[in-house]
Structure formats: structure tokens, C-alpha cells
């Protein structure tokens, strides 16, 4: 059999059938780890020197924007904002800063001061609840929300800040109210609007309908240049699907956090967004430092990485199953690295500096053992293979390196 073209080996159903995704040429990323990520009730807020490391790792991954805090929350957040902006200035970093603020002058003023002190442009992300349920709970009238929004945007622009207008709980807001609020925000000077699934309540169809509707609204009011952001949460476990649908529908920037940490059960994991956009050819970032980034965030926030976490979990590229391992080994024997990295993996491990790992356990076959021994420089014999297989079949779990090497040392044919 001749060597086939790689793209002929994997059939892509996204290109066939009645529903064909329409992906943009590029989409930007906004990393919320240092703001929304730190709103998780279980995280530890890391020291500033670690936040600076995190910022540099974001840039190494090609992330365009970092949310550097919520200065209205207190002095610690205001000081972190200044230090992060100074780091951007001193190192001439490409990553841009934005900052969350309520539609209150007391929240916006520290952002303007940070820009003035550091010379770093900061996008003010001015948020206010737009849904009827929030307005009822707060006893707000729509006119109050509208007035606060206009005043805040006008003040921020006067202070020299670019503005993104953020409607909290957008997915549960009515078109009539959104039309009024978004039109007023754009007329006041907002350069972007952010649509939020603040409570993780939406399903993909709702997200597609919302983002498409907002895109049409912006065209209708003569402002197609205004960018659309998408900010999702994972309460229903639909965060990544919703983010991808938002991109398809026209969002030009999407938000995420390392490991998906954030308010309640968290946000869309940015490592998953990065990999999926690369798989689709929308972005082509160097992701070899992605594990380092996620591991650092995990370590300093004290949020453990689940072993089965996509892409960055310990088990992401491990197998001890005989059928799976045999296929990977056959691909290696063909000298076909591309094939070996995809035959039983939807994500190429090599993209993030990892490799497919074959282990030995109760579901293994002889090929697992033979591959393991050969890769550890141990002569492969039928007798040793059988001995290790016998032990593996009796074990309730995958054998450790120490256990396998102990069998090897104690083996006498």
C-alpha cells in the first residue's frame, strides 16, 4: 500500500451535510484568569511576581488581551493592576490590557489613573446587568440602567480609555431591552460590546441566535465595525460548545481562563479554546508552553488539574489499553509521527510538547509490554513479556515504572 495523503486519512464531517460551520479567518482571545479566574471561591490569589509570570506566559501563547483586574474590589487589586501595566510597558509586551469595572466612576477612575501612570492603554470593560431577572432583584428600571451606562461610557472616554460595554446576563435579556442598551452604548462611543452567559444558562442554539442577532443590529444602526465579544460560564457544561458557536455566529473575540477557573464552577478553559481554534485552522499559535502555563496557574491558585482534563490532564495522552496501544505502535513502526499522534487522539500531543504514552495494565496486550521494554532499553523476550503480562492481569490498575522494573530485575528465564 502506498503512503496516503494525511488529509485523506481523517474524514471531516464539519465540511459535509446540511449544517456546515462558517468559521472566520481569525478570532482574538481575552484571558480572564487574573480577574474572573480569581473570583472562584476556592482559589488562592497569587502574589504579584507570579501574576507577572502568568502574564508573560499568556503572551507566549499568542493571547491578545489580558483582563488585569477589578480595581473597584480594593487596594490589592488596584496595586496589581499598576504592576501588571508597568510590566507591559517595561518589556514592550504585545499583549493588551483590559480591566473590568462597574458602570460607576469610582470603578473607572483607577483604570484611568493606571493608564496615566504607566502609559499603557487599557480597555475599560464596563458591565451592568441587562436581564429582567437581575433588574427585578436590584429594583432597577431600564431608564436607570440606560443612564448609568451612558454616563459611565462618557466618563471613561473623557478619561482617555477605550470602552467595551458589557451586558451581564445577556443570554436572558430580551431583544427589546438589548436593542435600547446596545444602541445607546455604541452611540456613546463603545468600540466593542460583550455578550455574557453570566450564569452559564444558555445552550448553543441560544448563543448562535443571540450573537447573530447582535451582529445584525450593529449593521442596522450603521456600526458594523463594533466588535462582538463572547464571555461564557460552564454551569451546564456547555461552555466550550457555546464559545465555538459564538465564534461561528460572528464573535471576533472570546474569553476564557486557565483550567476554566472562575466564578462558581468557572469559565471556558482557555487551553481548550486555543487547541480547538488551532485544529480548525483559525489560529496557529505555538502551544508548547501551554502545559507550563496551566501548571503554574494550578500551582499558585491551588486548584488541582483533574487527571482527565482535556489537553493538560495527566491522562490526556496515556493509554494502557491493548487495542489502542497496538495501533499507536504500528504507526510508530511505519515511521509516521503524524499518524501515531492522531490514531487514537483527537488532539496531537506534540502540539503542546507532550507525547503519546503507552503503559501496562490489566487491559493491556503483549504489544504494550514489548513497546515499554524496548523504549526503556530492556531486551524483549517472550518469557519476560509473559511474566509482566501475568502480573498486569492480576493488578487492579496500571503498573508503575517501579513495579515493572522490579519484575524485570527479579526475572530469571
Which stretches of residues belong to each language-model region?
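Alpha/beta enzyme core
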Residues: 2-4, 23, 29, 45-64, ...
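N-terminal capping/small domains of soluble enzymes
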Residues: 1-103, 360, 364, 370, ...
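Conserved active-site and cofactor/substrate-binding residues in soluble primary-metabolism enzymes
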Residues: 46-49, 53, 75-79, 106, ...
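A mid-to-C-terminal "edge-of-domain" accessory segment
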Residues: 2-35, 283-413
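Short, small-residue-enriched loops and turns at beta-alpha junctions
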Residues: 36, 40-41, 72-75, 131-134, ...
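Catalytic alpha/beta core domains of metabolic enzymes, predominantly
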Residues: 199-202, 206-337, 345
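Generic beta-strand/beta-sheet core signal
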Residues: 69-71, 100, 127, 166-168, ...
